[in-house]
Amino acid sequence: MHPDSSRKLALKAVVNQTFCQVCGQESHGAHFGAITCRACAAFFRRVAAGANFEVKCKDGRGRCKILTNGRSCCKKCRLKKCKDIGMDIQNFQFNRDSFATSTKVAPSLSTFLGRPEFLLSCSPGTSASTSQNKFIDLSPFIKNCKQVLMDDRKIPLAPGKTRLQKLSSSLDFEISANNKKKKTDLRKVSTLGFSEAIQIFENELLMTSKWLAHFEEFHDLGNDFKFKFLECTWNIWNRLERVARTAALLRDQKISNGKGNEIILARNCVIDLRTVKFEVEWFTNYSLSEISYFIEGVGDWSMNKPLQAIIDFNPTEIELNFMLAQISLTCASKQMDSQYQETIDNLQKLIADDLHSYYIKEMRLPVYSSRIQKMMKVNNMVLRVMWERKEKLSIARMFNIFNPNFSHPELVKDVF
């Protein structure tokens, strides 16, 4: 008789057996060629096919008793009994999943192409092109800024004013219904392209330089320090100045939720985000929709985060200039060499003394900690937006999304 046939007959003879042939407990059915309980079936499935440990007999004689409670059994003797009653590893079944599985993870399309998912739909005619990068010469702007910073004349000649008052004289945030001329001077920008961006860039550099020139102690420092300071701080200075100027406009329009549609870009420029047209061909090979995540005012709205806080605070011009000085000195202390740290600390102490004098003598406010707290809240929000922006720019550089070639790249490291 065929061995398989005899095995089937033997199994059929005991199929009605109600007890496990290994341990004597109540059986669960036929498992691997014998009638066993679930515990013995699981034991055989786990151990018989090759355990990761050496199975040894407990007493060393190979005659251990298989207890009916299924516990504390000798594994070697239990396995031997399983095999003696006809349990066979050939009855093991593998790969019974309804779908095929693989240990190898299939590469995603973004991994295969080497581009992030938000750029996968880009057209080969534009996004994959290798057009020559646009060269942008910043030398004229730098020359003008150096002339302002290195001018031997002290600006302004006002010995009776404090440092913060001198700084305030270089800025004017009065945008109100009573000053219709200033409101009409605001030029609405309908298109943001290369020429508009360069004009705004030049305006922001010169504004920061002229403001710093009103800081007498800063004016007396070395030229290398002054230009390095401008290089580190002009962007964060203009971010806060832009937020403050926008808040003044929104406050005048009685928009208190910080979600106005108009955002002031520079001293006399304003943009309506509902209608403005962005031209990005001069700094990228991708379309605007493909890289909107990286463009402020399109897919990146983080610049609006500090608006409500500064609208609620409503700082005076002296307080605003202190905020501008404090945030600039904070950024400079983190980016400039340690040899300049003492100089920066001294400048911070000078403006702090002026602010204290302003609160005590002019505002008659002996306890002003709450206003300091509100100022620091706005500055910290602007700094946080700046750090988040830097993270996005690092991703953009990794994938070569922005491709303009600047003559002085260190000056625009926080922009492109």
Curated annotation (Swiss-Prot):
A zinc finger (NR C4-type) spans 20-40, 57-82. The keyword Zinc applies. Its main location: nucleus. It comes from the Eukaryota. It is found in: Nucleus. Keywords: DNA-binding, Metal-binding, Nucleus, Receptor, Transcription, Transcription regulation, Zinc, Zinc-finger. Orphan nuclear receptor. This is Nuclear hormone receptor family member nhr-59.
